[in-house]
Curated annotation (Swiss-Prot):
Membrane topology according to the record: Peripheral membrane protein
Residues that bind guanine: D111, I154
Main function: Purine salvage pathway enzyme that catalyzes the transfer of the ribosyl-5-phosphate group from 5-phospho-alpha-D-ribose 1-diphosphate (PRPP) to the N9 position of the 6-oxopurines guanine and xanthine to form the corresponding ribonucleotides GMP (guanosine 5'-monophosphate) and XMP (xanthosine 5'-monophosphate), with the release of PPi. To a lesser extent, also acts on hypoxanthine.
GO biological process: GMP salvage; purine ribonucleoside salvage; XMP salvage
Name of protein: Xanthine-guanine phosphoribosyltransferase
Protein location: Cell inner membrane
Species the sequence originates in: Rhodopseudomonas palustris (strain ATCC BAA-98 / CGA009)
Keywords: Cell inner membrane, Cell membrane, Glycosyltransferase, Magnesium, Membrane, Metal-binding, Purine salvage, Transferase
PROSITE patterns documented for this protein: PUR_PYR_PR_TRANSFER (PS00103)
Length: 173
């Protein structure tokens, strides 16, 4: 990528900030939906973003077997090549009969769907849930809570902090 190309975040343009409180509520809503679809043998978090919703969903559903698939693609806000740094453990794979049946994969969001596609190819029969979905990634997930437009950038609470916001009207501050 050259210096002048905009990042995915800049290209998205429309900011969608999510507070801890809102995120917790959305994860609880996701848990309600998933509770009707289970039971699941184990939760698999797609790191790192999937770790937070996975903890909340596992707590709500009483699941104590938690594994990770470690995937890196975005360097801050630019998407590069997908790298699988760690797959599911043999023990979790056995629980899912080798194809992921009865396993619950969780991520914070699906955007282009690249990450979701990669995990689906690893565990085709697993249930894949994300808290937020953009249109391109939506066909990859079985369950999600809120859809946002493709030109939206979601700002998660662990990536942000409180800061001064200028008033909408110029000079009103
Ligand atoms: O649908 P996609 O276009 O593939 O994008 C979605 C993925 O991008 C983000 O992860 P990221 O690679 O930034 O890593 P992180 O979870 O460690 O922040 C997010 O947590 C999803 O896993
Ligand atoms: O914090 C993030 N917000 C997003 O909208 C997004 N899309 C891909 N990766 C992302 N990370
Ligand atoms: Mg991620």
């Amino acid at each position: 990528m050259t210096q002048s190309e905009p990042t995915e975040q800049k290209r998205a343009g429309r900011p969608f900030p999510v507070s801890w409180d809102q995120f917790h509520r959305d994860c609880r809503a996701l848990s309600w939906r998933l509770n009707e679809l289970g039971p699941f043998h184990a939760v698999i978090a797609i790191t790192r973003g999937g770790l937070v919703p996975a903890a909340i969903v596992a707590r709500e559903l009483g699941l104590r077997v938690i594994d990770t698939v470690c995937i890196a693609s975005y360097e801050h806000d630019k998407q590069g090549e997908l790298q699988v740094l760690k797959g599911v453990s043999d023990q979790t794979a056995t629980l899912g009969g080798g194809t992921g049946k009865g396993l619950l994969i969780i991520d914070d969001l699906v955007d282009t769907g690249k990450t979701g596609r990669m995990v689906r190819s690893m565990l085709p029969d697993a249930h894949f849930a994300a808290v937020y979905a953009k249109p391109k990634g939506r066909p990859l997930v079985d369950t999600f809570i809120t859809e946002v437009s493709q030109d939206t950038w979601i700002f998660f609470p662990w990536d942000t902090g409180l800061s001064f916001q200028p008033p909408l009207k110029d000079g009103a501050g």
